[in-house]
Amino acid sequence: MAIIGSKFITFEDYSNKYYKYHKQLAEFFSEKYYNLKYNDLYKYLFLDFINSSTVDDKDKIIKYVNRIEEGTVQEFIKVYTGETYLCYTLNKWLRNLNDYEYDYIKFFAGPFSYALYRYANNNRKQGIFSSKTFYRKMTIKLSDYYLYKISIGELICYPSFTSTSEMDMTKYSFPTDIAKQVNHITINDITVLLIIDYNCQNCLNLTPCICVSEYSENSDEEEYIFPPFSFFRINKITEKSGSPDDPHIIYMSTPNKKNLLEFDLKKGKTIKYNRLRNELYSS
């Protein structure tokens, strides 16, 4: 699992700026394209992308597309979970969305979202559990860590695909020197561990997290992927004062109706969230 940090966005930023992208992406988590083959969908989106784009790295994109041999869900997952162009570039674009770059998102994130949707619907294992605990260790800037601290009790979301693991990472060390070599960590960076309490029965997210360990390049990590714009509630933070290798722990959970009722109704968050979510479901 990559240990590159993910920036979250607040509910206000989501509703004011990112919601329109989420709505466009949400259609791929529906049955709209259910009868299309993966390679047909890629061909359709790719041609549209090439015809409308003015980017200079088309050759690089074409080379990436050729790695998806027949557009099977296995290949989508392997390319994403491996050390490839897709994982890093796709999430980088998703974290910095604007109207111009959405051409990329439609091409890359759309078919991958669609593949995950098909995989989840065809895999009975997705519905076996009602609740789980997921973990994600990552390195973030101190300034971003401060945003987590002031957002305790708030609803946040990640605009990128969020990889987590069912492995209890509190039992594993995370050497600072190795992390520095991999991610070029500086004195202005900090290591954190997200512990996410996931309840699929009460969860208000549009789409569930999806287990991809069966086809993942790192199957031993028991990887689960949360789709873009999945919402979480920051419950509390436990700061470690011991070894520098110990991460600060950020406790989070998937939102439910009780969480929404705790919001400041004067700001209209509960009403606005439900309205946006209903629009997504009807798209």
Language-model features: locations:
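Mono-ADP-ribosyltransferase
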Residues: M1-S283
